[in-house]
A protein has these predicted regions:
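Beta-strand-turn-beta hairpins that frame and shape the catalytic cleft
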Residues: 2-10, 114-122, 219-220, 231-235
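Conserved beta-sheet core of the metallophosphoesterase superfamily
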Residues: 104-109, 122, 127, 133-143, ...
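C-terminal regulatory/interaction regions
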Residues: 265-271
């Protein structure tokens, strides 16, 4: 797929709508909807790269209440013919077919490659990739297990959602609200994952979320495969979040930039 002149592809992640409370979430939702409205005129495609919600469980006949402004804007963009893709994150992995049926938005449960304007993108939320974090990887297998999803699904929605929201609040209280810190190339698991992929094939842009840091990192070539398809250095892009940074990536057919809707470009980590 090649972009038409003056058209762009946008990438966003980690809205965590629903957290930390209704008032703060609603304010953030309005900002996100404003941004989506402003890009409608030149968006050729939009990728939502996980953790749109702080928690989401989709019952067969019931979905969580709220988020009507966001859903309305996504429906408007989708109905206007703009393709939208959604990758589940660790906070909203329990999605079924609501997005596909109601919004015509496909849902992906694992990283996926796309090619645009002869550039190769590997896109995913980023949770559970790379070495380490074995406890979470085991937990993810449990959460993705159909039997576990069924057991949660037989709880009445008022009980299930109440329990999930309580655990989400407790998790935030335990982890605190301090900013994440870049650990360096050797300790960032997603950079290690990118390097491993580049040993096998060429990728121009790795697009992930999950880390809650805005990162634009040029990866060192590790082999004859360790560059992008055009021979340039591959780049690992982490999309940050819409809690502190309001960051997003945009691709114009030639160049990809990591930007902030709130002017927080000075917070972007680059090498």
């Amino acid at each position: 797929m090649n972009l038409l002149p003056n058209k762009k592809i946008y990438f966003l992640s980690d809205f965590h709508l629903g957290a930390p409370n209704h008032a703060a979430s609603l304010e953030r939702e309005k900002i996100i909807v404003q941004f989506l409205g402003e890009i409608k005129h030149d968006a050729a495609e939009i990728f939502l790269v996980g953790d749109m919600f702080d928690f989401w469980y989709e019952y067969r006949q019931v979905v969580p209440k709220g988020y009507v402004r966001l859903f309305g804007k996504l429906a408007e963009l989708s109905d206007a013919g703009i393709p939208i893709h959604f990758f589940v994150g660790n906070h909203d992995m329990w999605m079924r077919d609501y997005f596909q049926k109601e919004l015509n938005i496909p849902v992906y449960y694992a990283p996926k490659e796309f090619e645009r304007n002869e550039k190769k993108f590997l896109i995913g939320h980023g949770d559970g990739l790379g070495p380490g974090d074995h406890g979470y990887k085991r937990l993810k297998k449990i959460f993705r297990n159909p039997a576990c999803q069924w057991l949660f699904g037989i709880l009445p929605p008022v009980v299930g959602m109440g329990l999930a929201n309580y655990l989400s609040r407790r998790s935030r209280a335990q982890t605190g609200s301090s900013e994440e810190i870049f650990l360096g190339e050797e300790k960032e698991w997603l950079i290690t994952y990118c390097k491993d992929v580049l040993q096998q094939r060429s990728i121009d842009f790795f697009i992930f979320g999950h880390r809650h840091l805005a990162i634009d990192y040029r990866l060192p070539p590790l082999s004859s495969q360790g560059r992008g398809a055009g021979g340039e250095a591959s780049r690992y892009i982490n999309l940050g979040d819409w809690i502190r940074y309001y960051t997003y990536a945009v691709f114009d057919g030639k160049n990809l930039e990591l930007k902030s809707f709130k002017g927080n470009e000075n917070k972007i980590i680059r090498n």
